[in-house]
């Protein structure tokens, strides 16, 4: 650990010393969980199908026990999960291979980016009887508004421990979380939140006003005491307390943390969701009575009264909106929400919290949501479109001498990613605008590279007619087999606009009764990932949308790679028969085994 400067934080040093080795964590890992007590020797030898099956089954048991109110059984199953060797192996994989910050070290400077280092990490953690929580390393990343967002990066061992703890704690809370919470939860996404906005604010609903709420520094200010009270006396509670109180090191100076959960920790989003859970239940206590008549002339006969919630609610992490029929209803709920947040150490950001008419629109998760002639429109946010185009301009300006092929290779995934995010909204007109702007940007870039040449010469060099489309910015590329073909800039207008199918109410992947529902849902998403009839679609269909290494669904949230069964340099082809889709971590495992052979 880096030395701490000056003596003004003596109490902080003492706090670190108190965190050194006080919490039992992984002692007595059961031998029948993996079948052996021998130390792990080879990362590539792990049977991920078996490992994931064991962890999934245990998560489902915790979920069902929570649903049934069997709290002693929940505690016992949580203890079993914390001792599970399979959970440890899967947690190491997620912290060192699947997590976006896998290559970022904590204050100890350690990472585990190779199979050998992962094996050493597993064997080291496996022998621990007392856990040593270390402070996080403070780093900053830029925000969209130009400010800096602070992150707290735990050590790699703490990240693994947090992943282990998350698998024990998360399924129990998944059985209790409110239905309209969509952020940082398994099987849920931004698009589910946007689709719920669309469903709530369509012409059948009479809500005309929205509270567009912003919580001031939610992750940094959540009350530790409230989180600990909310999770109760569960196994590993003291370890969670240590993570909350661990502090952080910035410029070799230790700082205490008296509130908040560090952004950068694997368990932090779950703890934030636990703290913010309950707004939906709070609002459900306010209802309105609606009277239905059998016919307009029979108002005194056959009347039906129905209690309806006065408010609509959608939350994604710390961003949420509340809808109601009148402005008075919205203004009346604000003081109640403020009091509710204050109990958690939080407050609304008055500058960014707005009360607006739905007809005027509001921004939420990158979309502008607005009622127009009785319909709810979800349009790409103007500021996001500008920022996207500006990013392309800046990159081309900085790469004026880059080849056409490199430009296409860099821009196409970015353009396709932007389109895939917004394809579930009212985006066709915006897509057309962006395509035309990108064409203009590339035309100016092409001209600037050859100031002494005429426009006709530039057009012949950079533009082709492809599939009857004229003036396509393109380049002739050679594949690994020496075959030449023309590659063009991807067009957003080629993306099919289709509504996202929202997740059902409280549905969770941990519910064993919904296994088929989640499999079908993942397959439905996969069928929109590749064009139907394409080579990659056929490959996925042939392998029944499952990774052939770990047995999990291809679209379980992990990054995908396409593997050649027979390498191209050994005579293999790029045809569907020689390809198989794998999760990125599974793909690396295959390449670590020289003799690995996959079935079709």
List each language-model region with its residue ranges.
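Acidic catalytic cores of enzymes that act on phosphate-bearing nucleotides/polynucleotides
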Residues: 444-446, 453-526
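Non-catalytic, polymerase-adjacent accessory regions of viral genome-replication enzymes
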Residues: 1-119
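Histidine-centered nuclease catalytic patch
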Residues: 551-584, 590-599
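A conserved non-catalytic segment of reverse transcriptases
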Residues: 245, 251-254, 344-418
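Short, charged surface segments at domain edges that flank catalytic/cofactor-binding sites
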Residues: 507-549, 573
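Non-catalytic, peripheral interaction segments enriched in hydrophobic/basic residues
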Residues: 403, 407-464
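Conserved polymerase palm-domain catalytic core
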Residues: 124, 129, 176-180, 184-188, ...
């Amino acid at each position: 650990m880096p030395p701490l400067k000056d003596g003004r934080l003596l109490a902080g040093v003492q706090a670190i010393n108190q965190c050194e080795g006080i919490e039992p964590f992984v002692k007595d890992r059961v031998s029948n969980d993996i079948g052996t007590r021998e130390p792990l020797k080879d990362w590539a030898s792990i049977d991920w199908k078996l490992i994931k099956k064991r962890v999934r089954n245990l998560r489902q048991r915790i979920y069902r026990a929570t649903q049934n109110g069997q709290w002693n059984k929940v505690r016992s199953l949580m203890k079993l999960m914390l001792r599970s060797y399979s959970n440890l192996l899967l947690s190491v994989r997620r912290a060192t291979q699947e997590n976006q910050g896998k290559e970022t070290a904590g204050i100890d400077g350690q990472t585990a980016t190779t199979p050998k280092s992962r094996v050493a990490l597993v064997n080291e953690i496996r022998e621990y009887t007392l856990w040593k929580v270390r402070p996080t390393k403070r780093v900053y990343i830029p925000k969209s508004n130009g400010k800096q967002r602070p992150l707290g990066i735990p050590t790699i061992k703490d990240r693994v421990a947090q992943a282990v703890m998350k698998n024990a704690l998360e399924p129990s809370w998944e059985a209790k979380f409110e239905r309209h919470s969509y952020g940082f939860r398994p099987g849920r996404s931004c698009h589910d939140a946007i689709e719920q906005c669309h469903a709530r604010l369509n012409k059948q609903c009479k809500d005309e006003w929205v509270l567009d709420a912003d919580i001031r520094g939610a992750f940094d200010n959540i009350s530790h005491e409230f989180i600990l009270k909310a999770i109760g006396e569960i196994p590993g509670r003291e370890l969670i307390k240590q993570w909350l109180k661990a502090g952080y090191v910035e410029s070799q100076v230790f700082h205490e943390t008296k509130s908040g959960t560090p952004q950068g920790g694997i368990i932090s989003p779950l703890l934030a969701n636990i703290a913010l859970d309950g707004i939906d239940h709070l609002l459900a206590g306010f209802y309105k009575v609606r009277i239905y008549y059998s016919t307009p002339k029979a108002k005194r006969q056959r009347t039906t009264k129905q209690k309806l919630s006065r408010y609509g609610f959608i939350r994604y992490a710390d961003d949420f909106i509340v809808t109601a029929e009148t402005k008075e209803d919205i203004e009346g709920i604000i003081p109640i929400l403020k009091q509710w947040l204050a109990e958690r150490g939080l407050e609304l950001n008055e500058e960014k919290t707005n009360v607006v008419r739905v007809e005027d629109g509001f921004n939420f998760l990158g979309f502008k949501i607005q009622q127009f002639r009785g319909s709810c429109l979800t349009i790409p946010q103007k500021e996001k479109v500008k920022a996207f185009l500006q990013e392309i301009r800046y990159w081309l300006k900085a790469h004026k001498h880059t080849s056409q092929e490199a430009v296409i290779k860099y821009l196409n995934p970015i353009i396709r990613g932007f389109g895939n995010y917004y394809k579930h909204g009212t985006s066709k007109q915006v897509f057309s605008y962006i395509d035309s702007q990108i064409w203009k940007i590339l035309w100016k870039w092409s001209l600037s590279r050859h100031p002494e040449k005429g426009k006709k010469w530039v057009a012949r060099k950079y533009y082709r007619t492809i599939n009857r489309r004229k003036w396509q910015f393109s380049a002739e590329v050679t594949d690994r087999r020496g075959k030449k073909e023309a590659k063009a800039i991807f067009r957003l207008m080629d993306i099919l606009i289709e509504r996202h199918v929202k997740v059902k109410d409280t549905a969770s992947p941990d519910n064993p009764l919904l296994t088929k529902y989640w499999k079908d849902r993942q397959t439905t998403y996969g069928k929109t990932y590749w064009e139907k009839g394409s080579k990659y679609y056929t490959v996925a269909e042939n392998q029944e949308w499952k990774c052939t290494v770990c047995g999990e669904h291809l679209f379980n949230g992990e990054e995908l790679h396409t593997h050649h069964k027979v390498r191209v340099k050994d005579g293999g082809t790029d045809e569907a028969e020689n390809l198989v889709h794998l999760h990125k971590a599974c793909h690396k495992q295959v390449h670590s085994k020289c003799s690995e052979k996959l079935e079709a």
